[in-house]
Each structure stands twice: as structure tokens, then as C-alpha cells.
A protein has these predicted regions:
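Hydrophobic transmembrane alpha-helices and immediately adjacent juxtamembrane helices
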Residues: 1-264
Length: 264
């Protein structure tokens, strides 16, 4: 456990050092964060235009919560970058084992994702005139954290595709996030989709967690909310298992044939 905590700590230090080469706190706050707030605002106003106040709240809540997924899946870029700059083999030979190091490579995005979603949760509803039932709405915070964790596992699993097929990391990232945003109940209920698609989206992160957030806001029974949280946790665990298997096979194959080398 101590070694895992050390890896988490050092991964965060490395991740934020990497981010500091791109962002200052000002450019992150007034550039990236404002961009995310504008994105959520755009969809909320679009919901108001095509519907009513209830539609606007539905869309706003969905787009605030999904920001956590957006940032968590950026781990795809972080992991693909290790291959591009030639450091992937070094991660594979770490004394603590390659899996914790790989899974920790993008942890900084979980911190920024949680920050972005919570800032949006507190700022956008009053600014846009969308009332939330405070203090009950505060219970959404730990649910967003769970969604963030399951989305990070989803991103780690899909990073395996980007590590095997060089140059596709941005395509993988945008498809991963776009699929969740389109079919995961963010802007329209999952029930609008055909039955086979409704079944398929249950394996995506966000779907059950977002339903739990909506249930909290609507005063749903605690048992109903807890079942949804359990489903979200199960989905996240499944994606972490896929990520672990994918990375194990990647490293095993790379050790045999030397394919972990520099991307060129």
C-alpha cells in the first residue's frame, strides 16, 4: 500500500509539472476552465431554446457532470505521450510494477476534472437562473468523484488502443468522450435510444452516476440512488480490469519483440 501511495504522489507531482509547461494558474483558470464553463453554458442555453426550463436544467446538470469524464479521459494523451517520447519502456521496468505506474500516469486530470465540475456545479446554475435544491445538491459532489474515477478507468482502457496504434490518441480521446456525451444521458434521456443501444450504453461510465445525481436532485429514495452508485462503481471496476489486461498484454508483447521502443 505504501508503494502505491508513493506512486500516486509522484504521479501527481510529475503530472502537474508537465501541466505547468503548458498552463499557468491564470491560463488554466481563464482559458481552459472558462472554455469548459462556456461549453456547458452553450448546451444549457440550447436546451432552453428547444425546450423549457426543465429541459435547460436537465441539459445543464448533464453537461456539468460530464466535464469530469472529459478531463479524466485525457489520460489517453498522457499515456500515448510516453510512447511518443520513448519513455514507455522505462515505465515497464519500474521496480514497483508497470501497472500502478501506467494507471497513475494521468492522475492530474482527475484533480482538474473534479475542480472543473465542482466549480461549474456551484457557478453555472445561479448564473443561468437554474435553481438547484440546496443543500441536497451538495450530495452530488461525492457522486461526481465516483464518476470521475470510473471515467479514468475508461480512459486508461482506451489508452491501450492509442498505445498500439500510433498517432490516433486524439481520435480515441474525442470518440471516447463523444460517445459518452451523445449516448450517456447527458443531453437526452437514455430511454430515447433503441433497446439494443440502451442496453449497450450501460457499460459506459457516467450513465448510472448521472442518473444518481438526477435522483438526488429530484429527491429519489436513497435505495434507488445507492443502486445506481453501485452500478457506476461496477462499470468503473470493469474498465479498470480491461485497462489492466490490455496493458499487461501490451507490455508482455513488447518485452518479447521490442515493440515498446520509440515511436519515431
Amino acid at each position: 500500500m505504501r508503494s502505491v501511495l508513493r506512486i500516486v504522489r509522484e504521479s501527481l507531482i510529475l503530472g502537474f509539472a508537465e501541466m505547468s509547461a503548458v498552463y499557468t494558474w491564470r491560463t488554466w483558470t481563464f482559458g481552459w476552465l472558462v472554455r469548459l464553463l462556456c461549453q456547458a453554458t452553450f448546451y444549457a442555453l440550447l436546451g432552453r431554446y428547444v425546450g423549457d426550463g426543465a429541459t435547460m436544467r436537465y441539459v445543464l446538470v448533464g453537461n456539468i457532470v460530464v466535464l469530469a469524464c472529459l478531463e479524466a479521459t485525457i489520460v489517453v494523451i498522457s499515456l500515448a505521450g510516453e510512447r511518443r517520447i520513448g519513455t514507455l519502456p522505462l515505465l515497464a521496468i519500474t521496480p514497483s510494477g508497470h501497472l500502478p505506474v501506467y494507471l497513475g500516469r494521468g492522475l492530474q486530470w482527475t484533480v482538474t476534472g473534479l475542480t472543473s465540475s465542482l466549480v461549474a456545479w456551484c457557478v453555472l446554475p445561479p448564473v443561468l437562473g437554474v435553481p438547484l435544491p440546496w443543500p441536497r445538491a451538495a450530495y452530488a459532489a461525492p457522486v461526481i468523484l465516483l464518476i470521475l474515477a470510473s471515467s479514468y478507468g475508461y480512459g486508461c482502457a482506451l489508452a491501450g488502443v492509442a498505445l498500439r496504434t500510433r498517432g490516433v490518441e486524439w481520435l480515441v480521446l474525442n470518440l471516447a468522450y463523444g460517445i459518452v456525451m451523445t449516448f450517456g444521458g447527458v443531453n437526452v434521456p437514455v430511454t430515447v435510444w433503441p433497446a439494443p443501444l440502451r442496453i449497450a450504453v450501460n457499460v459506459l461510465p457516467v450513465v448510472h452516476g448521472l442518473q444518481a445525481v438526477r435522483g438526488i436532485l429530484d429527491g429519489a429514495p436513497p435505495g434507488h440512488v445507492l443502486r445506481l452508485l453501485g452500478a457506476e462503481a461496477l462499470v468503473g471496476a470493469g474498465w479498470y480490469a480491461v485497462a489492466a489486461l490490455s496493458m499487461e498484454r501490451l507490455v508482455s508483447a513488447g518485452r518479447r519483440d521490442g515493440s515498446l521502443g520509440h515511436a519515431g
